[in-house]
Amino acid sequence: MMSDLHIGETINRSLVHKYVAMANEQKADMAVLVGDIMDYESRIAVNQKVEEELRQIHAPLGTYIVLGNHEYRANINAKHKWLLQTGGTLLIDSVAMPDSTFYLVGRDDLVNKKRKPLHSLTKDLDPDLPVIVLDHQPLAFNEMVMNKADLGLHGHTHNGQFWPYPLIMKLIFECPYGYYKKGDTQFYVSSGIGCAGPPYRVGTVSELVVLHITFR
């Protein structure tokens, strides 16, 4: 799981190459990119052909991508077109079955006020199969619990990125970072692998998340 790459002025092709190498070392069954793949514009990703690096992610069940709020900042259509060239499956309010044992629901970002309610995406799914939801911003926990999602994967917060912002994140988000459980739904909010703005962190860490998931 990677979120918040923020490919742009500071997160360039050489860094993405390192991220992909790290991901491949994990030998994961599935890869998910949980929003804010790009920073403010698509120019650098396009000019440096960063999609060629992302196409090197090796995961037998595939790579799945959802949008973040930064995908809605400038050049929206160009960003969507570029994401389709990365070799991953772009899920925008849609459902995939990486194999026959579970569903993967990819939500549009909350920035889009017309995004579909979760119920409309899950109402026709087999209730006996687990449901994993990819949703960039960790702000719809109650909706996920009500709709009996099993696992939610999120990014967006960077866990504040700079001290003392982690304290502020705790005031804004029910869970700004890490593992959380509410009702029968489990969540993981990543601090992100990249950086927004200045290319450094103070008091927080960048992360590539490896999850071991067992269905009962």
Residue locations for each model-derived region?
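Soluble catalytic domains of enzymes that build or remodel membrane lipids, polysaccharides, and related
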Residues: M1-R216
